């Protein structure tokens, strides 16, 4: 029996890896072996960073809310506690958006939080 080198199946597999490696620098987008290693690493980075992105955005929202809260004479934690006491359920993403785009509305929320903290 003649030896079979893989042919069609192997070519398809290599082509798939090289397609994923498109845009990489140097030999990493032309040579299969180095492309395969880089593609594997890239997929690991993508997996990790899809989870990291959620944490990064939450940090950003909290930073923005804290800055706006301090302009209104409250700390972040006191603002959030005051809103909870006032039974105002607004998530951090929306609060951060208000802090950046609608300062008057955010100031009203901060006043409500202050009132509920004092009572």
Curated annotation (Swiss-Prot):
Matches recorded under Gene3D superfamilies: 6.10.160.10, Ribosomal protein L20 (1.10.1900.20)
Keywords, ordered alphabetically: Ribonucleoprotein, Ribosomal protein, RNA-binding, rRNA-binding
Molecular function GO terms recorded: rRNA binding; structural constituent of ribosome
Annotated transmembrane regions: none
GO biological process, one term: ribosomal large subunit assembly
InterPro entries linked: Ribosomal_bL20 (IPR005813), RIBOSOMAL_L20_CS (IPR049946), Ribosomal_protein_bL20_C (IPR035566)
Single GO cellular component term: ribonucleoprotein complex
Top-level taxonomic group: Bacteria
Family: Belongs to the bacterial ribosomal protein bL20 family.
Classification via PANTHER family: 39S RIBOSOMAL PROTEIN L20
NCBIfam families: rplT_bact (TIGR01032)
Role summary: Binds directly to 23S ribosomal RNA and is necessary for the in vitro assembly process of the 50S ribosomal subunit. It is not involved in the protein synthesizing functions of that subunit.
Protein name: Large ribosomal subunit protein bL20
Species of the source: Shouchella clausii (strain KSM-K16) (Alkalihalobacillus clausii)
Source organism phylogeny: Bacteria, Bacillati, Bacillota, Bacilli, Bacillales
Gene: rplT
């Amino acid at each position: 029996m003649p030896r079979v080198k893989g042919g069609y199946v192997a070519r398809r597999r290599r082509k798939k890896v090289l397609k994923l490696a498109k845009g990489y620098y140097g030999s990493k987008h032309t040579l299969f072996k180095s492309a395969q290693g880089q593609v594997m690493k890239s997929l690991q980075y993508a997996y990790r960073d899809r989870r990291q992105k959620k944490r990064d955005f939450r940090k950003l929202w909290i930073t923005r809310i804290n800055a706006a809260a301090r302009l209104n004479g409250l700390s972040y934690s006191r603002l959030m506690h005051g809103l909870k006491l006032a039974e105002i359920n607004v998530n951090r993403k929306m609060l951060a958006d208000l802090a950046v785009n609608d300062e008057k509305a955010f100031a009203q929320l901060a006043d409500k939080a202050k009132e509920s903290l004092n009572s």
